[in-house]
Amino acid sequence: MNLACKLLASFLLIFFFSSKGAVSKKNITILGALERDINLDIPAFQMSEHVEDIQWSKGKTKIAKFKNGSMTFQKDKTYEVLKNGTLKIKHLERIHEGTYKVDAYDSDGKNVLEETFHLSLLEMVSKPNISWSCTNTTLTCEVTKGTDFELKLYLNGRMIQKSPRKVIVYKRASNQIASFKCTANNTVSEESSSVVIRCTEKGLDIYLISGICGGGIILFVFLALLIFYISKRKKQNSRRNDEELEIRAHKVISEERGRKPHQIPGSTPLNPAASQPPPPPSHRPQAPGHRPQVPGHRPLPPGHRVQHQQQKRPAPTPGTQAHQQKGPPLPRPRVQPKPPRGATENS
């Protein structure tokens, strides 16, 4: 009997202390997503008439109080205590990470519940972006946001690669038609993208085609501008050449006009004998001053010859006279005195 009583007493003591510790304190870890709302639910707790006051605190700072069915204290609008005692935190940010504690009291002010929560926040993953190249037979899966996530790549429903990094690069064996799915997930979120790739062996990559088209357009614009520039330069050069030819023509004409002597109309040449035609070859040259005798004509005496020559010589025109006066004065012929008639007859 004594041994049985001792065993029973030991069992009751162990159960009492263990149950008391479980009710009094629990450290619960909760993961939340940034920019989302979260509820801190009290496990195995149900509101009753005996519970009068519920207080929530973060660290040593009281943030909310619920008493007699209504909110009596609220640090800011981010925190709210629901009717079942749950704490709701709106639009989570990094400052909301930490340890939260809840205490429940009955009408006598006795603490009937005490729980502790540790809140950790994670960034939600973004939707994966899948890109590929038919030329290089490569496929890339990439995410831009997320913490503590895992990236997985599936080919025709079968997982072929996974990585904790933000990028997965997969080298395909051929350009056959294939279905790919990329999934990114962490504890608080999950996103996925799917694509069906159709590449032919002799096909061109869309980026290569776009590059060729863009290069052709740039080349066409360059050639058009070059042709326009060349035609414009040709027009300017032809116009300049025409102007130079016109200036040269005016210059030549003005020089030719300056070289020609100023002739006065009605003037006679200085040497009338030079303008006369040469005598026929049958005529022999005669001595100067000898004139052919006409039959039946009597030669005049020397005095009469001089007078006769002076009468036959035409009077110089004003233009010729002016032209002759420019040079040195010409010698004037001597006029022999007429011999008396008696002397001529006696001789």
From Swiss-Prot:
Residues 328-340 have a biased composition (Pro residues). Residues 1-24 form the signal peptide. It is found in: Cell membrane. One of its GO terms (molecular function) is signaling receptor binding. Residues 58-70 are annotated as: CD58 binding region 1. It comes from the Eukaryota. Residues 101-115 are annotated as: CD58 binding region 2. Glycans are attached at residues 27, 68, 84, 129, 136, 185. It is a single-pass type I membrane protein. This is T-cell surface antigen CD2.
